[in-house]
């Protein structure tokens, strides 16, 4: 495989860790390296060192990775193209290099490989072949937006990009609506207005949404608003529809618990856990542990056990 000669191109924004005098060789393994999603200053020292020392770099698009690699002083990197269209066929070639004693660093155009980007098939193949997989964590659009969203509890479902076919998109949105919790979407600029309309049609209740546009880049915007206001916000300024998008859609607001709900019976999971645990420990201890497993209240589980005696 010939080396990729990177020359020319725009100067990257920001500064990155300076090259070390020497980069020690890496052990033969697959290194899954997160790269910046927009601002090159977000590259970690460990990621920079790994990329400099790797025998090979498996890149989603060597042209897109050029500014980053140039900024790290990797001007003659040995590159392998590994993208969505060739990952399955290329995986065995990559693994053969590792079996031969060489190290391979896996990167995507931006962010963490395998998260709405190629990489998962190669990583799975490496595990199946008994090859060591070493994560080198860093930037990810999902955690970047989550950190700036203010989501109580931080619990959400990661969906990423929806299918492009209308029927499949509708099915996924219906499933997300039925799930009832917050979820994360990625979207391209040419589909963002259509997505806003689809979300309003699929979701009931007064939900909130946090829109992250051009995260970590020069024109970054992070805006939190009612979901119903999203179409108007997009139309208010042509710039609002430009760039790459990450959206965190909150779950529906919690309904006040009625007296009837407050006195509802424990869940089936809680009752089953209580039944099994009561065979080996006192009822109150079993109720506390069953409550931790099921989310039910320990007192209700305990009272339910007493009624069954």
Protein language model regions, located:
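Conserved helicase motor
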Residues: 80-88, 162-165
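Class I SAM-dependent methyltransferase SAM-binding "motif I" and its flanking Rossmann-like core
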Residues: 121-179
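Glycine/small-residue-rich loop that forms an oxyanion/phosphate-binding "nest" at active or ligand-binding sites
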Residues: 91-144
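A contiguous loop/helix-start segment that scaffolds small-molecule binding in enzyme catalytic cores
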Residues: 2-9, 16-19, 27, 182, ...
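Glycine-rich, flexible N-terminal cofactor/catalytic loop recognition
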Residues: 2-84
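General beta-strand structural signal in soluble alpha/beta enzymes
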Residues: 59, 133-138, 185, 211
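Loop/turn-to-beta-strand initiation segments
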Residues: 28-30, 100-105, 181-182
């Amino acid at each position: 495989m010939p080396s990729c000669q990177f020359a020319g191109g725009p100067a990257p924004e920001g500064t990155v860790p300076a090259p070390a005098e020497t980069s020690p060789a890496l052990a033969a393994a697959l290194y899954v390296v997160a790269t910046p999603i927009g601002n090159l200053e977000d590259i970690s020292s460990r990621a920079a060192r790994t990329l400099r020392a790797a025998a090979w770099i498996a890149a989603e698009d060597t042209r897109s990775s050029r500014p980053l690699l140039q900024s790290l002083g990797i001007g003659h990197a040995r590159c392998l193209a590994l993208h969505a269209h060739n990952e399955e066929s290329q995986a065995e070639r990559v693994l053969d290099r590792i079996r031969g004693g060489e190290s391979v660093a896996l990167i995507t155009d931006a962010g963490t490989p395998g998260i709405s980007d190629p990489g998962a098939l190669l990583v799975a193949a490496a595990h199946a072949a008994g090859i060591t997989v070493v994560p080198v964590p860093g930037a990810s659009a999902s955690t970047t937006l989550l950190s700036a969203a203010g989501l109580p509890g931080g619990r959400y479902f990661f969906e990423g990009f929806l299918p492009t076919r209308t029927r499949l998109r509708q099915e996924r949105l219906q499933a997300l609506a039925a799930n009832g919790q917050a979820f994360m979407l990625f979207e391209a600029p040419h589909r963002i207005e259509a997505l806003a309309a689809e979300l309003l049609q699929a979701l009931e209740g007064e939900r909130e949404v946090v829109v992250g546009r051009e995260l970590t880049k020069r024109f970054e915007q992070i805006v939190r608003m009612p979901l119903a206001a999203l179409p108007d916000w997009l139309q208010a300024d042509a710039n609002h529809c430009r760039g790459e998008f990450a959206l965190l859609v909150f779950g529906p607001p919690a309904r006040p618990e009625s007296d009837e709900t407050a006195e509802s019976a424990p869940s089936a999971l809680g009752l089953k856990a209580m039944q099994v645990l009561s065979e080996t420990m006192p009822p109150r201890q079993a109720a506390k542990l069953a409550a931790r497993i099921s989310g039910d209240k320990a007192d209700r589980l305990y009272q339910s056990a007493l009624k069954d005696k």
